[in-house]
């Protein structure tokens, strides 16, 4: 399976933080091709490949951002964000409410004639979505607490790029699966596709504690340079993997990754962080 095909399969199921089981059921067959598969109590997917010491843990998070239903109204539902949703981008977005069946919804927006741009951006992480049905009908299908995902998309851009829902962090999962295809080692490797990264890192914390690995590597997305972004805060597209340097990380392992990249002539970039990384590495280091 080529990388684009793998990525399309991985980005297909939703899996809003706290509801990762649906992703597990959809992808279990695919994951079983890579080793012994299980799901732990936190919802994380664990793939084990037996071997000798040192035991290596490789993490990428399975969960995605989304919303949760907080109120059902006549024709509408009120939603609260789950994870790092950028509320500047949600107006008019198409959603799927995961009730007793999947329900289509569209985020409402106040017309520009009736508001200024600043006042239309939610300050508290909530929004209202149009569901096109009465409250009575809606309550037969939707309950407060139901998770809500973004409408799925996967589109090619140019020759070898894509835009897709949930590349954060299904892209990281794709990287680890492809890496496992190429790795030829007798060392024990555990892949952790962790739950609830978007809401506090619960999955990675539990999995790292249970795995008790000798070393760990967390793979997540980062920022690519765009015309209006500060290039000092971003990586360069096609510039190679971004290797993190942070007080929360092992300097020894960061330098090891750089030396390996140099040895095998693999493009890389350094990502310098002055505190926490904002990834599961923060949670793995204390587990």
Q: What residue ranges belong to the model's regions?
A:
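N-terminal hydrophobic/helix-forming segments and targeting peptides
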Residues: 1-287
